[in-house]
Amino acid sequence: MEKTEIVRKYVEKLINSPINLTAYKDFDEAMAFLYLDSVLPVKSEDLGEFFLDIGTGGGVPGVFLSVEFDKKGLLVDSICKKVHFIQQTCKELGIKKVETLCARAEELKGKGDFFEKFDSAVSRAVSKIATVLELTAPYVKVGGKLLLYKGPGYNEELGQSVNAMKELGVKLSEVRRYSIRGKDRFLLVFEKISHTPDKYPRRIGIPEKRPIR
C-alpha cells in the first residue's frame, strides 16, 4: 500500500471511530489539521532512529510521523482504548514501525529502560510547556530534540518554563511558525543539552499540578 493511501485510510478510521478520537469529522479538515499539521513543521528535523510520542491520543502526530519519515516510534497514552485503536489500525494498514504503550508518561520510568533512550520526543496538545518538558525530557538522549506543537498563546507558557528548562537540561533552539488553512501554528524545538536528574518526572499528577518554577 502506498504511503498516501495508508495516511488517507488512517484518517478515515480516526474520524469514523466510535471512540471520540478527534473533533474533526470532515475528511479534508482532518487531513489538514491532523496529518498535515503533524508532518509539515517537522520536514526539516531529524527525528533519529527512535522517537517518543507522549499523550498520542488516536496516534497523532506519532503515526503520521512514523509513516511519513519511516521512523520507529513509541506512542504512549493513558487511555487504553485509544492505544488499542492504534494497535489494531496499524496492524490492518501494515504500519510496522509504531509501538504502543498504555501508560501515563510519569509511569515510563517503571515500565522499562526508557530513561534517556529516545532520539527525540514529540507532544501535541497535551499540557503547558513546563509540564510537557518534564514528561518528555527525562526520556530523550543528550543531543536529542523535543518538539512541541503549540498554538498562538505559547509565549506566556514559555516565559513560565525558564526554570524547568534549566532543571531538565534543555534549551529552546527554535520557534517555527507555519500556517494550516490560514491558522497560525508553532513548533517549539528544544535541544537536550545535559542529563536530566533521574528524579524526573515526578509521580503521577505532580508535573501538571505543580510545574517546575
From Swiss-Prot:
Pfam families attached to this UniProt entry: GidB
GO molecular function: rRNA (guanine-N7-)-methyltransferase activity
Location (main, coarse): cytoplasm
Keyword terms: Cytoplasm, Methyltransferase, rRNA processing, S-adenosyl-L-methionine, Transferase
Record EC number: 2.1.1.-
Entry coiled-coil feature ranges: none
Function: Specifically methylates the N7 position of a guanine in 16S rRNA.
Family: Belongs to the methyltransferase superfamily. RNA methyltransferase RsmG family.
Protein name (Swiss-Prot/TrEMBL): Ribosomal RNA small subunit methyltransferase G
